[in-house]
UniProtKB/Swiss-Prot annotation:
It comes from Rickettsia bellii (strain OSU 85-389). This is Isoleucine--tRNA ligase. The gene is ileS. Coiled coil: none annotated. Its EC number is 6.1.1.5. The keyword Repeat does not apply.
Length: 1108
C-alpha cells in the first residue's frame, strides 16, 4: 500500500486573494497567456476589438466590468479551439488630454495655449496622456484579464494617424464630406463644437434652472387691400391703404414705437398696438433675434389689455392671467397661426435692425403648444431649427458670440460678457423698453459638456461634416446583420438612432489631435482645396520628410498655389483637428496601419466577431464604427455586440470620488479576490443593459464569495482531503454504473452543455447559474449521499468509482468554467494535476511552479473545452432523481417551517403522485435523506389538495385590460378549465407566462407541500413518539462529537475515545454513534478535548481523546 498524497493540502477556509496572486505569478512565470495564443496558431480566429480607453485617469468599475466581459469570451473562445489575439489600445487625443494639460500647466483657452506655444502644449499632452498606463496594467492584470500590452496601439502614433488621413480622403473622394457653417452643440469652456451624439452620452444632461422670459414684439405690418383679404381681423377702421414695404417699419430701441399715418399701419381707436408674445429660456439669444415662428394650425387668441392687443396661443392664455389682467370670463377672437404668416414686427434691439429680410413671422412645424406662448423667437446663429427656417426665407445668420461664449463688439453694451451672465442685463433692458412681460424660474434637463460639466450653448460654427444622412438607410440595413445583446438594442436604442442620424461634424478647432489633411488657398481669388490621404502624398507635394503629423509641425507645411498664375497665393492647412471619436471609429484599420501595411491581415480580421461596451456607446463608439465602416467598406464593423448597463452605488447614485461612495477595486481584490467581483458583475442583469447597484463595503462581493466561490472550493477541498487520507488518485471516468455516479455525470453533461450554449449566445448570467446549480447538486446531494462510499475503510471498486466520479466532475467543470472564474478554476486544475515528487518527501506535493513541467496541459486555459461526446445522459434517471431531490428539499422546508430539526427522525412521509412507481426504487434513499421510517404512496390527489389559479396580473393586464375585472372574479370562483394543455377563462386562452396553477393542500392537513411543479403533494407526519425522540438525541450526540473532533483539530481518519454520561441513549444507539464518529466509549482517560453540551434538557460534558 502506498502512502502517497497525490494532492495539495487544501484549507476549507482558503485565502482566495492569496491563491489568486499565486496563480497570477504562475501565469507570468510560465508565459501562459502567450502559450494560449501560440497553441492555436493556424486555427480559426475569433476576432475581438478592444475599445481604447484614455490612460490619463485610473480605471473605474465600469472599465473593470467591460474588461471582465471581454476576458470571459476571449478565454472561452480559446478553450473552444480558436486563436484569440487581444491587442490593447489607447485613446490619446482630444479634450480629455487637453483639459488635463491645461489644468497642469495653469492655462486656459485658445489664446492662452497659443501664447504658451502649440508645440510645447502638445508635447505636454503627449507626455501626460499615458500618465496612468502603468496603473492600468496593474488593474487589468489583477482582475485576471489577459491582454497584449506590449504591442498596444495608440491613436497618437504616426501610423494610426496616417490611416485616419486615408479614411478622410476616401470619404472626400466618395463625395461624403462637406464644409458648412451650422449650428451645433458648443462647449464654450473647451472652445469647441461637439457632435450631436456627444450630447446623448450618459449624464450629458443635467437638471438646470434658467430664467425664462416672455417678451412682446410690436407688429407693424403695412396693409394693402390684398392683405385685408388674408388678414380680415386687422380691418377695424384702416386709416389708409399703404405700400406693402416692411422696411418702413421702424422702432427706437428705447422709446415707444413711432407711427406715421401716411406710411404705417393705421390702428383702430380700440387698440393702439398689436403685440405678439414669445417665450424663451435662452434670454441671451434675444439680441440676435431675426424672426418669429408660429404653428400654422395652432389657435391664437387676441387678448386686449387697455389699448394694446396681445397675441398668444389660446391654450396659454390662462398662464398669463395675472400679467394680462384677466378676470376669467372673457371671450377672445381666435385666429389660426397661418393668418399671422408674413406679418412684420419691430426689432427688439437695433443691433441688427437693418438685416435683410428679417423681423417677420413665419410658420414652423417645430412650434408646438405647451410651455410658453406658442410663439418661438428665431436667432439663426444659435438654434438648429432657427437656422434652417431663416435660411429658407433668405435670412443670413448672425453670431455675435465668440469662441469663449462671450458677446462680441456687435453687441457693444454686452461686449466681453459671458452669455449666461448677460441674461439679467438683457431683462433689465427689456423692462426699460416696455417689451418685458414676465420672468419665471424654469427647471429643465439641459445638455452639459461631457468634459467640463459646464452648460453647452448652441452656436453656428464652421465645420467639416460626414454626409451621414446620405447613407443612413444603408446603416439601418447593415445593422440587421448584427446580433445585439440585449436584443432590443438592434431596432430600438441603436436602430432608431441610426434612422434619425444626422450629418456628423468631425472637425474641432483644438490642438492635440490628428490634423484634418486639408490645405486651402489663402487668396479667395484663386480658390483651391487639396486633401491628402498619406504621408507619401504630403512628402511629395511639400518636399519634406514627415516625422510627426501633429500640430504645429503639420501647420508649417505650405506651398505655392498651383492654380494661381501670379504665384502669390499659398496653400495653407486649415487649423482644425479631428473629432477624437473619428479616431476611435477608425480603430479597426488604424491599429493595422491599413491600407499601408497588413492589408490582407485587416481584410481577414474585419468585421469583428465580438465587441462590448456600455449602452451609451450606441451613441458613441458603436455609432462611429458603424458610420465609418458603412461609408468606407459597406459592411457592419462587428457581428456580435454586448451593451451592458452602468454600475451605481447602493442608493442608485453615480460612482464618484467626490461622494466617496465606492471602494478601490484593488482593495476588493485583496480582500475577496477578483473572481468574486467578476461573478458579482457578470451574473447580474448589468450584462443585459440594466443597472447594478454595488455597495461600498463589498457585501455583495462577499456574498458571491460565500454563495458561489466557496461551494466550488468546498467540493475541491472534500476531494483532496479524503483522497489524500485514503492515498487514492482520481482518474477521469465516465462509465460508472453506480446510480449516484450516473446521475451526477448526467448532471455534469447538462451543466457543461448549458455553459457552452449560454456562452455561445453571449449570456454569462445563465452560464454562472449553470455552474452554481451544478455545485449545489454536487455538494448537497452527490457528496452527501456518497459519504459512506468515501468513508468506508476497504478500498474497493465502489470507493475508487466514487473518487473517479468526483475527480471527473471537478476537472471537467474546472475547464468548462475556466473563463467564468479563471483564477479559482486554475487553482483547482493545478491541484488535481499535482503529482508526487520523484525524490524527497513523497508525503508533500510539488510546488506550484515546478510540478507540471513537460505537461502538455500546463494550464486549464490551455485545455480544450470538454468533449461532450464522452458523456452519456440517463434522462429517465435524471428526471426521477430530480424529483427525489425536489421531495427532499420540500421536506426540509416543511421541517424548517414546523421547527422539526433535521436530525429528529419522523415516522413517515406520504407521497401523493401519479409517478410513484419510478420513486419506489429510491425509497431507501428518500427515507435516509428525509430521516423518516417509512414511505406511503398514494395517487388520490383530489382528496388532499385543490388546484388554484394564480394570474400574472401585470402581464395579463397589458394584453386584456378590459377583461381583467371578469377574469379576477372568475379565478376566485375557480371558473376556469384546462383543455388540451391550454387554460381557458372567460373565453380567453391564457399564455403560459400569464398564469400558474398552484396546488393548495386542504386546510386541515399539516406538514404538506406541493412538488414536481405543483403536480404532486407530500405530507410529513410530524407526531413524535418517545422512541423517535431518543433516536433524535443520538443523532445530536453524533453532531456534537463531530464538532468536538473539528475543534480538537483531529484528522478525519483519527480514531477516538468518547466519554458522555447518557446511558439511556448510548445503550440503545451506541453502535450507530461509534460507527458515525470512528469512536469507542470509554471511561477514566485523559481527554484531549472537553465540550459542554446540552441534550434532552440536560447539561453534559463530552470528552474525547485521539487513539494513537
Amino acid at each position: 500500500m502506498t502512502n502517497t498524497k497525490y494532492y495539495p493540502e487544501v484549507s476549507s477556509n482558503a485565502d482566495f486573494a492569496t491563491i489568486e496572486k499565486e496563480i497570477l505569478k504562475f501565469w507570468q512565470d510560465n508565459n501562459i497567456f502567450q502559450k494560449s495564443i501560440d497553441i492555436r496558431e493556424g486555427d480559426a480566429e475569433f476576432i475581438f476589438y478592444d475599445g481604447p480607453p484614455f490612460a490619463n485617469g485610473l480605471p473605474h468599475y465600469g472599465h473593470l466590468l467591460t474588461g471582465f466581459i471581454k476576458d470571459v469570451y476571449a478565454r472561452y473562445q480559446t478553450v473552444r479551439g480558436k486563436k484569440v489575439e487581444r491587442r490593447f489600445g489607447w485613446d490619446c487625443h482630444g479634450l480629455p488630454a487637453e483639459m488635463q494639460s491645461e489644468k497642469e500647466l495653469g492655462i486656459s483657452g485658445h489664446l492662452a495655449i497659443t501664447n504658451f506655444g502649440i508645440e510645447k502644449f502638445n508635447a505636454h499632452c503627449r507626455d501626460s496622456v499615458m500618465k496612468y498606463a502603468g496603473e492600468w496594467e496593474q488593474y487589468v492584470t489583477r482582475q485576471a484579464r489577459w491582454v497584449d500590452f506590449k504591442n498596444s496601439y495608440k491613436t497618437m502614433d504616426k501610423n494610426f494617424m496616417e490611416s485616419v488621413l486615408w479614411a478622410f480622403k476616401e470619404l472626400y473622394n466618395k463625395g461624403l464630406l462637406y464644409e458648412s457653417m451650422r449650428v451645433m452643440p458648443y462647449s464654450w469652456a473647451c472652445e469647441t463644437p461637439l457632435s450631436n451624439f456627444e450630447t446623448r452620452l450618459d449624464n450629458s444632461y443635467r437638471e438646470r434652472a434658467d430664467k425664462a422670459v416672455t417678451v412682446s414684439f410690436v407688429l407693424c405690418h403695412p396693409v394693402s387691400k390684398s392683405t385685408l383679404d388674408v388678414i380680415p381681423w386687422l380691418d377695424h377702421g384702416i386709416q389708409k391703404t399703404i405700400n406693402n414695404d416692411s422696411a418702413n417699419c421702424s422702432m427706437d430701441p428705447v422709446d415707444k414705437p413711432r407711427y406715421d399715418t401716411e406710411n404705417f399701419l393705421g390702428i383702430t381707436a380700440n387698440y393702439k398696438e398689436y403685440r405678439i408674445l414669445a417665450w424663451t429660456t435662452t434670454t441671451w439669444t434675444l439680441p440676435s433675434n431675426l424672426a418669429l415662428a408660429v404653428g400654422s394650425d395652432i389657435d391664437y387668441a387676441l387678448v386686449p389689455k387697455g389699448d394694446v392687443c396681445y397675441i398668444i396661443a389660446a391654450s396659454s392664455v390662462s398662464k398669463y392671467a395675472k400679467e394680462l389682467e384677466l378676470k376669467g370670463d372673457e371671450q377672445f377672437t381666435i385666429i389660426k397661426g397661418s393668418e399671422l404668416q408674413g406679418l412684420s414686427y419691430k426689432p427688439l434691439f437695433d443691433y441688427f435692425k437693418n438685416h435683410p429680410n428679417s423681423f417677420k413671422i413665419f410658420a414652423g412645424d417645430f412650434v408646438v403648444e405647451g410651455d410658453g406662448t406658442g410663439v418661438v423667437h428665431m436667432a439663426p446663429g444659435f438654434g438648429e431649427d432657427d437656422q434652417i427656417l431663416c435660411e429658407s426665407k433668405g435670412i443670413k445668420l448672425v453670431c455675435p458670440v465668440d469662441n469663449s461664449g462671450k458677446f462680441t463688439k456687435e453687441i457693444p453694451d454686452l461686449e466681453g460678457l459671458q452669455v449666461f451672465d448677460a441674461n439679467d442685463k438683457i431683462i433689465i433692458k427689456l423692462k426699460e423698453q416696455g417689451n418685458w412681460l414676465k420672468t419665471e424660474q424654469y427647471i429643465h434637463n439641459y445638455p452639459h459638456c461631457w468634459r467640463t460639466d459646464t452648460p453647452l450653448i448652441y452656436k453656428a460654427v464652421p465645420s467639416w461634416y460626414v454626409k451621414v444622412t446620405e447613407f443612413k438607410d444603408r446603416m439601418v440595413e447593415l445593422n440587421q446583420q448584427i446580433n445585439w445583446i440585449p436584443t432590443h438594442v438592434k431596432d430600438n436604442l441603436f436602430g432608431k438612432w441610426l434612422e434619425n442620424a444626422r450629418d456628423w461634424s468631425i472637425s474641432r478647432n483644438r490642438f492635440w489631435g490628428t490634423p484634418l489633411p486639408v490645405w486651402k488657398s489663402d487668396d479667395p481669388k484663386y480658390p483651391r482645396i487639396d486633401v491628402y490621404g498619406s504621408i507619401e502624398e504630403l512628402e511629395k507635394d511639400f518636399g519634406v520628410k514627415i516625422t510627426d503629423l501633429h500640430r504645429p509641425f503639420i501647420d508649417e507645411l505650405t506651398r505655392a498655389n498651383p492654380d494661381d498664375p501670379t504665384g502669390k497665393s499659398t496653400m495653407r492647412r486649415i487649423e482644425d483637428v479631428f473629432d477624437c471619436w473619428f479616431e476611435s471609429g477608425s480603430m479597426p484599420y488604424g491599429q493595422a496601419h491599413y491600407p499601408f501595411e497588413n492589408k490582407q491581415w485587416f481584410e481577414e480580421h474585419f468585421p469583428a466577431d465580438f465587441i462590448v461596451e456600455y449602452s451609451a456607446q450606441t451613441r458613441g463608439w458603436f455609432y462611429t464604427l458603424m458610420v465609418l465602416s458603412t461609408a468606407l467598406f459597406d459592411r457592419p464593423p462587428f457581428l456580435n455586440c454586448i451593451c451592458h448597463g452602468v454600475i451605481l452605488d447602493a442608493t442608485g447614485q453615480k460612482l464618484s470620488k467626490r461622494l466617496n461612495n465606492y471602494a478601490d477595486p484593488l482593495e476588493l481584490f485583496d480582500k475577496y479576490g477578483s473572481d468574486a467581483l467578476r461573478v458579482t458583475m457578470l451574473s447580474s442583469n448589468v450584462v443585459k443593459g440594466q443597472e447594478l447597484l454595488i455597495d461600498k463595503d463589498g457585501k455583495m462581493v462577499f456574498d458571491t464569495l460565500r454563495l458561489f466561490i466557496k461551494p466550488i472550493w468546498n467540493a475541491y477541498h472534500f476531494f483532496t482531503m479524503y483522497a489524500n487520507a485514503d492515498h487514492i488518485k482520481g482518474e477521469l471516468n465516465f462509465t460508472s454504473e453506480n446510480v449516484l455516479d450516473v446521475y451526477i455525470l448526467s448532471k455534469l453533461k447538462i451543466a457543461v452543455e448549458k455553459i457552452k450554449e449560454s456562452l455561445d449566445s453571449f449570456d454569462t448570467g445563465t452560464a454562472y447559474h449553470a455552474v452554481s446549480e451544478f455545485f449545489e447538486v454536487l455538494n448537497n446531494w452527490y457528496i452527501r449521499r456518497s459519504r459512506a462510499r468515501f468513508w468506508k475503510s476497504e478500498k474497493d471498486a465502489d470507493k475508487q468509482s466514487a473518487y473517479n466520479t468526483l475527480y471527473t466532475c471537478l476537472e471537467t467543470m474546472a475547464i468548462a468554467m475556466s473563463s467564468l472564474v479563471p483564477l479559482i478554476s486554475e487553482a483547482i486544475y493545478l491541484g488535481l494535476y499535482c503529482h508526487p515528487r520523484k525524490s524527497g518527501d513523497p508525503e508533500k506535493p510539488e510546488c506550484l511552479d515546478s510540478r507540471l513541467c513537460g505537461n502538455d496541459n500546463l494550464s486549464v486555459h490551455l485545455c480544450d473545452y470538454p468533449d461532450l461526446s464522452k458523456f452519456k445522459i440517463n434522462s429517465e434517471l435524471v428526471d426521477t432523481m430530480d424529483t427525489v431531490l425536489d421531495i427532499c428539499n420540500h421536506s426540509l422546508f416543511i421541517r424548517s417551517s414546523e421547527n422539526a430539526r433535521v436530525r429528529q427522525p419522523l415516522s413517515s412521509i406520504t407521497i401523493i403522485s401519479k409517478n410513484n412507481d419510478k420513486l419506489k426504487s429510491f425509497e431507501d434513499l428518500i427515507k435516509d435523506e428525509i430521516n423518516v421510517k417509512s414511505v406511503i404512496y398514494r395517487d388520490d390527489l383530489e382528496n388532499y389538495a385543490v388546484k388554484k389559479l394564480s394570474i400574472n396580473f401585470p402581464l395579463l393586464g397589458k394584453r386584456l385590460p378590459a377583461k381583467m375585472k371578469d377574469i379576477i372574479a372568475a379565478s376566485k370562483k375557480n371558473e376556469w378549465e384546462v383543455t388540451s394543455g391550454s387554460l381557458i377563462i372567460c373565453n380567453e386562452t391564457l399564455n403560459s407566462d400569464e398564469y400558474k396553477l398552484i396546488l393548495e393542500p386542504h386546510s386541515h392537513i399539516k406538514g404538506a407541500s406541493s412538488f414536481a411543479h405543483n403536480s404532486s403533494l407530500l405530507i410529513l407526519d410530524l407526531e413524535l413518539t418517545p422512541e423517535l425522540i431518543d433516536e433524535g438525541i443520538a443523532r445530536d450526540i453524533v453532531r456534537f462529537i463531530q464538532q468536538a473532533r473539528k475543534n480538537a483539530d483531529f484528522a478525519i481518519t483519527d480514531r477516538i475515545l468518547i466519554d458522555i454520561n447518557l446511558p439511556k441513549i448510548t445503550d440503545i444507539y451506541g453502535e450507530f454513534i461509534k460507527e458515525q464518529t470512528l469512536g469507542k466509549f470509554a471511561k477514566d482517560f485523559i481527554p484531549d478535548h472537553i465540550s459542554e453540551i446540552e441534550l434532552d434538557n440536560h447539561k453534559l460534558q463530552l470528552k474525547i481523546k485521539k487513539v494513537n
